[in-house]
Design a protein with these regions (language model features):
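N-terminal low-complexity or simple alpha-helical regulatory segments
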Residues: 1-66, 70-72
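Extended, Lys/Arg-enriched charged tracts that mediate electrostatic binding to polyanionic substrates
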Residues: 75-76
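Alpha-helical bundle regulatory/interaction domains
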Residues: 1-33, 79-225, 229-235, 240, ...
Length: 247
């Protein structure tokens, strides 16, 4: 049944815990009073989320939910990183199905479909394969193509806030869902693939290993050289990997 919810937060841990179908952690890196808003919209098969928070931060998200996920920026601004992939205001990102990524994006929209639906719809609408990629991919559609899902996503978020009764109406939800799916698939089909990010993906792998090394020693203080040594990586390289992965 279609539904929606809009929640506001002043605690980053509560915000991370509320993100759907993920184990998320957020570390705020800037000074100030943290505030965030999370909008969740479920139509029939399509699920949507809108994320907005006010302070610089680094996040880690691990998702295993059998859905094909795409995301894009909801507001203009400088290029940022999600899982080693540069996210630009006019780009759209296809995520791998079992993603585990470091995130430095604060104003973000996401949509997902069951994997089998994404595959069949991609073939039917655009004649292309949309099975989730092995590694996250960033695509740049034409500005006019990208503007449509951004506009529809923003409108859905506004309805969730101001007129949630429209979203729960089955026919209205179906019409909105079809428009969003078509706009999303058109962007994915025509988008220009971003440059090879193999070096960034390697840096993200180093950060995952570093994170595991820290988690294996939760009750003792660790100095940076110790986990670097345990994962077989020089301290300088770990630092470079952190900067390229987290920004």
């Amino acid at each position: 049944m279609p539904s929606s919810a809009v929640r506001r937060f002043t605690d980053s841990d509560d915000y991370a815990a509320a993100i759907r179908a993920t184990r998320a952690e957020i570390t705020v890196t800037g000074r100030g009073h943290f505030t965030a808003k999370l909008t969740r919209i479920d139509l029939h098969r399509l699920r949507m989320q809108r994320f907005s928070d006010n302070l610089p931060r680094v996040g880690h998200s691990a998702v295993m939910n059998g859905r094909a996920i795409i995301s894009f920026r909801t507001h203009p601004g400088p290029s940022l990183l999600w899982g080693g992939v540069e996210t630009k205001p006019a780009s759209i990102t296809r995520h791998n199905e079992h993603l585990s990524e470091f995130i430095r994006v604060r104003l973000l929209g996401a949509m997902s479909l069951p994997v089998e639906d994404m595959v069949s719809i991609g073939a039917a609408i655009a004649g292309c394969g949309l099975t989730p990629p092995k590694d996250a991919l960033t695509l740049t559609p034409s500005p006019s193509a990208m503007a449509k899902p951004q506009r529809l996503h923003a409108a859905a978020g506004q309805l969730a806030e101001d007129a949630p009764e429209i979203i729960i109406h089955p026919e209205a939800a179906w019409s909105l869902e079809q428009a969003l799916i078509e706009a999303m698939v058109r962007c994915l089909a025509e988008g220009e693939l971003g440059e090879d990010r193999s070096a960034l993906r390697y840096h993200v792998l180093i950060m995952h290993r570093f994170r595991r090394a820290v988690e294996e020693n939760p009750d003792q203080p660790l100095y940076i050289p110790e986990p670097c040594k345990s994962i077989g990586c020089r301290t300088g390289r770990c630092g470079h990997a952190a900067r390229s992965s987290w920004g």
